Amino acid sequence: MPLNKDIKKVLVIGSGPIVIGQAAEFDYSGTQACEALKSEGIEVVLVNSNPATIMTDKEVADKVYLEPLTLEFVEKVIAKERPDSLLAGMGGQTGLNLAVELHDSGILEKYNVKVIGTSIASIKEGEDRELFRDMMNRIGEPVIKSEIVTDLTAGLEFANKIGYPVIVRPAYTLGGSGGGIADDEEQLRTILESGLQLSTIGQVLLEKSVKGWKEVEYEVMRDSYGNCITVCNMENIDPVGIHTGDSIVVAPSQTLSDKEYQMLRTASINIINAVGIEGGCNVQFSLNPNSFEYAVIEINPRVSRSSALASKATGYPIAKLAAKIALGYGLDEIKNAVTQKTYACFEPTLDYVVVKIPKWPFDKFFGADRELGTKMMATGEIMAIGANFEQAFLKGIRSLEIGKYSLDHNKFKEYSISKLKSIVMKPDDERIFALAEMIRRDYMIDRINKITGIDMFFLEKIKWIVEEEQRLKLSKIEDLDKEWLHHLKKKGFSDKAIADMLKVSPDDVYRLRDIWSIKPSYKMVDTCGGEFEALSPYYYSTYEQYDEVEVSNNKKVIVIGSGPIRIGQGIEFDYASVHCVKALKKLGIETIIVNNNPETVSTDFDVSDKLYFEPLTEEDVLNIIEKEKPDGVILQFGGQTAIKLANFLKEQNIVTLGTTADQIDMAEDREKFDELLERLGISRPKGKGIWSLEEGLEEAKRLKFPVLVRPSYVIGGQGMEITHDEEELTYYLENAFAKDSKNPILIDKYLMGREIEVDAISDGENILIPGIMEHLERAGVHSGDSVTMYPSQNISDKIKADVLEYTKKLALAIGIKGMINIQFIEFEGELYVIEVNPRASRTVPYISKVSGVPIVDLATQVMLGAKLKELGYGIDVYKEPELVSVKVPVFSTQKLPNVEVSLGPEMRSTGEVLGVGRNIKEALYKGFVGAYMYPSKEKGKILATINKHDKAEFLPIAKDLASVGYKFIATSGTCALLKEAGIEVEEIRKIDEEEPNILDIVKNREVDLVVNTPTKGNDSKRDGFLIRRAAVERNLGVITALDTLRAIADVELEKFDENKDLEVFNIAK
């Protein structure tokens, strides 16, 4: 039992939906913490609104509540479960803020719940900018000259006093939200207004900018007896001024002298002792590169993105140990899981280099402002391990899946040196390639060091890589001797990079390696630099020393992971990979995971029998397959990242379980797929590929507007649009053909129908559909951005029977063994197929949890030859549950400047929440509250600007909202419509009219909700865009689909916010 005998039942708060700044790392830390508590015999109650996580599986905690993370709902859970303790530091900023609110509102005291681990007082000292600064002054730790402000005037006065540039850091926000660097008064006004609104306590710290100093982080652990250790120190290649989540980070630090290292280590220990941390904590410093002067930037008094990285970089499980410390254990009483001999009070030592590179979402958002600053914009990250910096760095570049295998980037070849210089000085996501191009043109690296603040050590390494690339370009394959090739491999060059420079194929380089037997050896991550024998099967490749892998003769399967989190391919795929591994283990099969994402559960070293932390490229994966010789490889659960390897593995004669390359081709190749549907007698929306504007207008006439247009090769609906007339279509096609004239544009009849989706399992004879899901928004909104309902609410028995029949026909005709995802449209009583994915999709975790069918487990067994009839869940459609569950998308558009907010066929959401209720309206209410979409309890003002196609549909919704007390403000057209219907409305001037106009009332937050249905193709598109952006940046709700507004109105009519009897449901029953 734990040392503190009073702890029997602990409430753990999760981090909610995935947003930029708070991603899968909290699923990893939360899962670890729950398992650590359970291993001590403690009852664990979990509340988290995110259904896509492993953490919310019924095996992870004893009671699981997928409920909104708000005071009212968490209080309901506490009242029902009566936990004696609360563990706050596992749910990121969301969990921390909620714990502070529960304490301040008296709820914890009312139910007699103690906070274990880091106390609320310590959290406040770490998070409240003023308390933290005062404490630093008390213990003599230097902080940057700063001022706490709570209004605009005080901020402008302070900036004038200390001089620009100044850094703005709001209190209690996530990923630097609302912060930034202001170079002048105008910029400061904008950033400060946003920061004061986003801070939960309306407090912002303004500090003198030390842009250009080094940024260094220490990950520190402390127990309640005051024992402290530093787990890992990390150095950002990018200097202060770029958020650490958007920086390339290296561990351990490469450029600190021993004196600097010890000085900052001592400071971190002083700080966490003073704050009184019990558990893990991250301390960030800025260090003057030219002296020993340093300053404390901030601390995170909880597990964080950096602690997930430190855990994976060292093999030291920070979250697990933080949970044990919360129970009263000391660091000297907890065994190191990797060595089983040493204790947690041993500081890890690293005999390798780790590099983390962020993954940004700009491929989804062409118009976005890509400049990096103190506000985080990356959705995910990759990590790479190497024997030296160059190796880890080049592995990292090819792990990003941006089609780059070296530092050579065609885009920058055309740029002038002055243009390259401006990119490097105002960095964006591609700055590293611009920097390499400058070096390629013999720009002096000491001058690059002066303009960027990047340390000479890193610039020298990058220069070496660029020089080798140039040397290869001037050589032929005959010039490549054994020594040179071996040296390039040691430094991380891939076969493809070498081949591209030599203008030969990667196979040619591979053959040379084979002849000279230049093969990778795999080293173990062992926490102790090889001093003790390690038991962790956690490996990375190098071309250096001897091999540490023991290859068994057992039956074994390799599961390919999904790589970094991005829009369209999120944590859902990690969920599927982990469940696949668990299913294989139950069958007694040795499991091996290959993945490169440090935030996820799949890369926790005790999930699989072996973990290879490697890039998911053809070469890196093949090396592991050749080493391990598995009985099969599973690609179905790793999203597009894994599916992309199918053809390559087929060419190498490697067995893939479940889906084959030919089956993928049949579903993804438009012509083959059309032929298949024709043969099976299944309808799809009419359409074809067109090659010119004239042909497009002709086809649209034949199909009749509206039509759906999109480029032919896309993922996540990139570049799709619905056009309503010739003007809109012409505008789209002119732009599309200007961007790419080599491929056709697909044009389909747009059916304004109901969208239906299924994830099914097929064994080649029968299929099982765990549940038929219905989308709330009509077709045309990407399935990942739609509210999804299960059981379906409006689908007739006839259509359900058609869904089953079509799914069965398709699965059997394609020859699926395992998973298939199909999307349908029901239009005027007919069913049409719009898309088939022969793999797990992003709805798998949701439908698994709400139907109770362990989809991935069953699909894995089927891939290995089991039949559905033997597995205990029947065939065809599984029985529907009593409760209704909705999945509501969550967006991070606020964090990405200049990005479109309106919903359409291109996916934009980063995460999701679940709402569970006795009926659909109850479920929707909880879903909207959990996704922060529910308008305020005080029925406020709605700003409505509705386009001409939508006015008739908008009117009855407006009447309902007016009946519960909402007031309307609208521009002339919508205003006339509402007045005529007898709805009270105030008219507001349009953007191009005199002030105060529509934009001013949004900027001054004089409304509570903006309803704007976008028009396309003309200038009002820009007006609508400006209004939507202004609203999102000021934390106002924005709704662009009337189906969503209809649902909100239905929920409002029920007056749930006055109803105190809403139940919370434990889904682990």
Swiss-Prot record:
<keyword id="KW-0464">Manganese</keyword>
<feature type="binding site">
    <location>
        <position position="242"/>
    </location>
    <ligand>
        <name>ATP 1</name>
    </ligand>
</feature>
<keyword id="KW-0677">Repeat</keyword>
<comment type="pathway">
    <text>Amino-acid biosynthesis; L-arginine biosynthesis; carbamoyl phosphate from bicarbonate: step 1/1.</text>
</comment>
<feature type="binding site">
    <location>
        <position position="241"/>
    </location>
    <ligand>
        <name>ATP 1</name>
    </ligand>
</feature>
<feature type="binding site">
    <location>
        <position position="284"/>
    </location>
    <ligand>
        <name>Mg(2+) 1</name>
    </ligand>
</feature>
<comment type="similarity">
    <text>Belongs to the CarB family.</text>
</comment>
<feature type="binding site">
    <location>
        <position position="284"/>
    </location>
    <ligand>
        <name>Mn(2+) 1</name>
    </ligand>
</feature>
<feature type="binding site">
    <location>
        <position position="783"/>
    </location>
    <ligand>
        <name>ATP 2</name>
    </ligand>
</feature>
<feature type="binding site">
    <location>
        <position position="210"/>
    </location>
    <ligand>
        <name>ATP 1</name>
    </ligand>
</feature>
<feature type="binding site">
    <location>
        <position position="300"/>
    </location>
    <ligand>
        <name>Mg(2+) 2</name>
    </ligand>
</feature>
<feature type="binding site">
    <location>
        <position position="298"/>
    </location>
    <ligand>
        <name>Mn(2+) 1</name>
    </ligand>
</feature>
<dbReference type="GO" id="GO:0044205">
    <property type="term" value="P:'de novo' UMP biosynthetic process"/>
</dbReference>
<dbReference type="Pfam" id="PF02142">
    <property type="entry name" value="MGS"/>
</dbReference>
<dbReference type="InterPro" id="IPR006275">
    <property type="entry name" value="CarbamoylP_synth_lsu"/>
</dbReference>
<feature type="binding site">
    <location>
        <position position="175"/>
    </location>
    <ligand>
        <name>ATP 1</name>
    </ligand>
</feature>
<dbReference type="GO" id="GO:0005737">
    <property type="term" value="C:cytoplasm"/>
</dbReference>
<feature type="binding site">
    <location>
        <position position="176"/>
    </location>
    <ligand>
        <name>ATP 1</name>
    </ligand>
</feature>
<feature type="binding site">
    <location>
        <position position="837"/>
    </location>
    <ligand>
        <name>Mg(2+) 4</name>
    </ligand>
</feature>
<feature type="binding site">
    <location>
        <position position="298"/>
    </location>
    <ligand>
        <name>ATP 1</name>
    </ligand>
</feature>
<dbReference type="InterPro" id="IPR005483">
    <property type="entry name" value="CbamoylP_synth_lsu_CPSase_dom"/>
</dbReference>
<dbReference type="GO" id="GO:0005524">
    <property type="term" value="F:ATP binding"/>
</dbReference>
<feature type="binding site">
    <location>
        <position position="215"/>
    </location>
    <ligand>
        <name>ATP 1</name>
    </ligand>
</feature>
<feature type="binding site">
    <location>
        <position position="823"/>
    </location>
    <ligand>
        <name>ATP 2</name>
    </ligand>
</feature>
<dbReference type="GO" id="GO:0006541">
    <property type="term" value="P:glutamine metabolic process"/>
</dbReference>
<dbReference type="InterPro" id="IPR033937">
    <property type="entry name" value="MGS_CPS_CarB"/>
</dbReference>
<feature type="binding site">
    <location>
        <position position="780"/>
    </location>
    <ligand>
        <name>ATP 2</name>
    </ligand>
</feature>
<dbReference type="InterPro" id="IPR011761">
    <property type="entry name" value="ATP-grasp"/>
</dbReference>
<feature type="binding site">
    <location>
        <position position="835"/>
    </location>
    <ligand>
        <name>ATP 2</name>
    </ligand>
</feature>
<dbReference type="Pfam" id="PF02786">
    <property type="entry name" value="CPSase_L_D2"/>
</dbReference>
<feature type="binding site">
    <location>
        <position position="298"/>
    </location>
    <ligand>
        <name>Mg(2+) 2</name>
    </ligand>
</feature>
<feature type="binding site">
    <location>
        <position position="208"/>
    </location>
    <ligand>
        <name>ATP 1</name>
    </ligand>
</feature>
<keyword id="KW-0055">Arginine biosynthesis</keyword>
<feature type="binding site">
    <location>
        <position position="298"/>
    </location>
    <ligand>
        <name>Mg(2+) 1</name>
    </ligand>
</feature>
<feature type="region of interest" description="Oligomerization domain">
    <location>
        <begin position="402"/>
        <end position="549"/>
    </location>
</feature>
<feature type="binding site">
    <location>
        <position position="755"/>
    </location>
    <ligand>
        <name>ATP 2</name>
    </ligand>
</feature>
<feature type="region of interest" description="Carboxyphosphate synthetic domain">
    <location>
        <begin position="1"/>
        <end position="401"/>
    </location>
</feature>
<comment type="subunit">
    <text>Composed of two chains; the small (or glutamine) chain promotes the hydrolysis of glutamine to ammonia, which is used by the large (or ammonia) chain to synthesize carbamoyl phosphate. Tetramer of heterodimers (alpha,beta)4.</text>
</comment>
<feature type="binding site">
    <location>
        <position position="129"/>
    </location>
    <ligand>
        <name>ATP 1</name>
    </ligand>
</feature>
<feature type="binding site">
    <location>
        <position position="782"/>
    </location>
    <ligand>
        <name>ATP 2</name>
    </ligand>
</feature>
<dbReference type="InterPro" id="IPR036914">
    <property type="entry name" value="MGS-like_dom_sf"/>
</dbReference>
<keyword id="KW-0460">Magnesium</keyword>
